[in-house]
């Protein structure tokens, strides 16, 4: 009887438990997002964000092919490591669809897709076996600018390319040219990080900047024709001329002075709106511009010029967390990836910081291949407290392997002649013997002697003398800033002292022993 009761109780308990409603089992659904990161050695890096996943896999198929299902992506795809998928062995200049899926122990995520187009390597890039070098770099300012003259023609460019000596013989001058500019006057926007009231340049401004230099009939065409015409007169040079192209800054904020302004103002790449609060998107904008320039260069196909590399426009690179406005600049998170991309194609990354600017001692970490220091001594007028030091300049060059920028100006330096009539002409940084503009308040300065011409010529001579004295002549590279038009103004000046100064500078450039190394 007792055994019978135990049996009945057990059956009752079983039925009671079995009839209770079960709690639903919670299944964590895997979710993933992917975005383009970079191209590298014939492949592509894809950035992954995921939740509730054990692993994420990705693969690429030619655009238009059937999309793979989740099982196939896992079987044939590449597994993400450190939130990054690398898919290699891709053809250049080809459109691909990248597919990715996340897995968990119980299910798959939704398959996600990203369209990419691999960069092309042009014939002149394939044939390049090493990085291009040069002894001297001549700055050619321009772009969509409010400065005058706005456009370059063969007459203006000529004195940058060749010079005629005292005996009437013509000689080749600079080896390389930097195409540089900092504004899009048509859009009233700045290509460079600044704290003024200008709007940050967007993708359209970047295009206009590149087109000014590289489009049909642009400065590249004029420079190429100038070299060809000179070669017909004096024979081909012993070197091939180089060009370095300036890259606009990918400025985080639409209005840099307003730290609440938009970070998504710039434009789209691969159909996606870039957000410059993400350094990866700033890198992507740089790469877009590099590819735009390369494509334009290929179309232009200059006969006498090679594209040597790209230049960082900002003259200060805040790359340490304790630097001023670091959270809005973060160059240490941007430039190394840009440098890596350039190096794949044997392009160099260049920079010219102003005196003691942040970043001058971090160029190796930032991936910068060559740097020229600005001494800024040309503007250390006697009436100003002297703050610039040749000792610092050359100690820095010795420590980091930098070169030096030579600095002088022509009529561009005449702004501020309002004090000329009162006998205080200190505002002129023009090297010219005669005033070329009516920038004084009375509009009467033009044609008058420039009382600071001798001082400014001596400042230019100081650059050359100090460079030699420090042992850098024949050892370190030279860059030259000459304002917007000083080379032409000196070379064509009716004043003998101006022409003498021009030839003195030219001899310093062409007699540099580094040219023979």
Report each predicted region and the residues it spans.
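Bacterial Sec-dependent N-terminal signal peptides
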Residues: 2-5, 15-37, 119-120
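Extracellular fibronectin type III
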Residues: 105-120
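Eukaryote-skewed repeat-based solenoidal scaffolds used as protein-protein interaction platforms
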Residues: 247-248, 254, 277-403
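Substrate-binding cleft of secreted/luminal carbohydrate-active enzymes
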Residues: 356, 372-383, 389-517
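N-terminal catalytic cores of secreted or lumenal carbohydrate-active enzymes
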Residues: 122-288
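Recognizes extended acidic, P/S/T-rich segments that occur
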Residues: 58-91
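Extracellular recognition modules
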Residues: 97-101
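Surface-exposed loops/turns
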Residues: 41, 92-93
